[in-house]
A protein has these predicted regions:
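Low-complexity, Gly/Ser/Thr/Pro-rich intrinsically disordered linker/tail segments
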Residues: 210-246
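N-terminal capping segments
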Residues: 38-162
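Hydrophobic alpha-helical membrane-insertion segments, chiefly the h-region
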Residues: 26-36
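N-terminal Sec-pathway targeting helices
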Residues: 5-27
Length: 246
């Protein structure tokens, strides 16, 4: 006697598919937040959570200087150079290098800055080294013993250099205030301090819905372009805001 055995395939319920899709989306968003510049995610989230909030438009600073003669103004070149660090996925690694420069695929927050300047046609290392050599007493970390292998990569030193050679700007940030936000422009340099920890970053040419610029920086594990400037300001972490004198 033969027994007929029917094999029934279990069908996946629509609810399960929906839950799996939500989980997958969350994983993708978290992954992007950690490893990539989540500008598009931030903007999508803003429109999703504030569908009726108007976008604050901020007048962009006009810059005509083109130091490297590539047809792109210096401020835009700085931003492009900083953004290249994000694109290149530079690994955050803090080491001492003979000659000063780390490998192209390594760096810390200050390396993003000098690379951005290099993209605009400036040799930030030489400028910092020359200023320290001529004014070592102004740079506490050097202790009258300049070290070109590391000085230009120390945020403490850059926080002395930029007030001397760039325009010092406001530390006050007001979201949705177009006049105040016009003082925060692409290519601006921002220095923060939290306890004894220093950090340096560059402002993006992109802004959030409230008109606040995004920040391009390397705080590890890789460089990112993120919406964190308002948080820094609210926490009192911003101790320097500079603009190169184009």
């Amino acid at each position: 006697m033969k027994t007929n055995i029917k094999h029934h395939k279990k069908s996946i319920r629509p609810q399960a598919i929906f839950v799996l899709a939500i989980i997958l989306i969350i994983i993708v968003i978290v992954f992007a937040q950690i490893f990539f510049a989540p500008v598009w995610l931030n903007r999508f989230g803003e429109r999703l959570t504030h569908p009726f909030t108007s976008v604050v438009n901020v007048k962009e600073l006009a810059v005509t200087t083109d130091t490297d003669g590539d047809g792109i103004d210096d401020a835009s070149d700085l931003v492009d150079g900083a953004r290249l660090e994000v694109k290149n996925h530079t690994t955050y690694r803090s080491n001492y290098y003979i000659g000063g420069y780390p490998p192209d695929d390594e760096g810390v927050c200050s390396d993003l800055v000098w690379r951005a300047f290099k993209n605009a046609g400036y040799d930030l290392k030489s400028m910092v080294d020359d200023d320290i050599a001529a004014n070592s007493g102004l740079y506490p970390l050097t202790d009258d013993k300049p070290d070109p292998n590391i000085d230009f990569r120390r945020v403490n030193d850059l926080n002395v250099f930029f007030p001397r050679h760039a325009e010092t700007l406001t530390l006050e940030l007001k979201a949705r205030d177009a006049d105040n936000l016009a003082l925060w422009q692409r290519g601006d340099i921002v220095v923060t301090k939290r306890g004894s920890s220093w950090h340096i970053a560059m402002l993006s040419d992109k802004r959030n819905i409230d008109g606040v610029p995004y920040v391009i920086h390397n705080a590890g594990p890789f460089p990112t372009e993120v919406d964190c400037l308002e948080k820094w300001a609210a926490n009192g972490r911003i101790v320097g805001h500079f603009r190169w004198e184009y």
